[in-house]
């Protein structure tokens, strides 16, 4: 049976701007039917051990784990010193993840900057991940590479947004300390097949981002045409929605995961809405849907 966490997609800007604290997010997460709360490094005021212990204790007081850190490393920066800073930050974030009690740290390739040479950028990403591999192992933290769309704070979309590049990186870093974080909605945004990708990465899936998207004012073909532009940002026709109400067939996704024996974390990416109350209601509905899916495909939890 998977465990259920949530990432505060709808509250991200408020947390980054400190209109909501990480402790307030943990308190909100504790009101949902969750096993854990997902954090991002920029949610934290400090990486100092005493502060991290207080964050972990706050989660434990709400009956929550902090299983995963949603990091967005940018390994496609042409400046070697910038890539070095990204590597050193990631090393420290493995420690942060472990001190929070987590075992998973998301990694990415970086931004798809104009003018990048594909082969050279792939080598940068692969070299950075191989350098990080022994440090992840030492911390006991799995690097989980997400098939990603675009970080909220980035200018350009993900370099490895296409499945061809994403799989090339996973194949090149064939280590038990680099796993896949599967996000079906990001495959849709890339104009690719989310079910084919799942079958391809199934043996390496360690974590999953559960989100759902719907189209407003456009079609799948429009989205695929837009995905061919390597510099495109968020497509306005793609909207986040309550999980189970969008384009993903979650019965198909979870039956595939259950067949493989998957028992890792599934993290909700939702909480959109004009107010915190509406965002929380959407998170609650998404959590209820996912719990129902877990019961259906893995068997009902013991009371």
Which role fits each region the language model picked out?
Residues 1-103, 120, 126-130, 137, ...:
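N-terminal pre-domain/capping segments
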Residues 3-4, 36-37, 69, 126-247, ...:
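Acidic/histidine-rich catalytic cores of soluble enzymes
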Residues 37-39, 67-69, 102-109, 142-147, ...:
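Short beta-strand segments at enzyme active-site cores
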Residues 41, 73, 109, 205, ...:
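Residues that line or immediately flank small-molecule/substrate-binding pockets and catalytic motifs
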Residues 106-122:
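Flexible, glycine-rich active-site loops centered on histidine and acidic residues
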Residues 245-259:
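A short, acidic, amphipathic alpha-helical segment used as a generic capping/interface helix at domain edges
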Residues 264-290:
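C-terminal/domain-terminus segments
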